A protein has these predicted regions:
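Hydrophobic pocket/interface hotspot
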Residues: 12
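Acetyl-CoA-dependent GNAT
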Residues: 6, 15-81, 85-90
Length: 149
């Protein structure tokens, strides 16, 4: 997988700025830490930020396992005609673990994209003192008896 380098920072930042309505909370220092930490994929105008859990971690009504992957953000440069699906599928192979993410419940376009790429709706979550509802999706590579809280 192709990770972002320091020299990619401005391009990565500008891609996120295209989606300020969806990612108003993304700060430039966060993006720099993701790049410096090796947790930012940048390929063909697609950016994925992620991490791996060191211990079981609750995500809303479900629990991600130790060493599972959390996909924080995936964004596509709106000026490029590239396939986010192909980069996401390549990321699933790279991660070699269950991949989790949370998404705003009203983000129908993103949810259809995740489902089209093999992710399943497995739980619920919320932000902003439970005023902003969300859903939890999982791309499951491992067998598990239960991931519910």
């Amino acid at each position: 997988m192709q990770h972002a380098a320091h020299s990619d920072f401005e391009e990565v930042k500008n891609i996120f700025y295209q989606y300020k309505d969806i990612f108003p909370h993304i700060r430039t220092d966060y993006l720099m830490r993701q790049i410096e930490g090796g947790h930012c994929i940048y390929k063909d105008g697609i950016v994925i930020t992620y991490n791996f859990y060191k211990r079981p971690q609750p995500i809303g009504t479900v629990i991600a396992g130790k060493f599972h992957c959390i996909l924080h953000q995936i964004v596509k440069d709106s000026t490029k005609d590239t396939s986010a699906s192909s980069v996401l599928k390549e990321f699933f192979e790279y991660a070699r673990a269950d991949v989790w993410l949370s998404v705003r419940r009203d983000n129908v376009v993103a949810k259809k994209f995740y489902e089209k790429n093999g992710m399943k709706l497995v739980g619920e979550c919320s932000w902003a003192a439970e005023t902003l509802p969300g859903d939890v999706y999982l791309y499951q590579r491992t067998r598990s008896l239960s991931n519910e809280l």
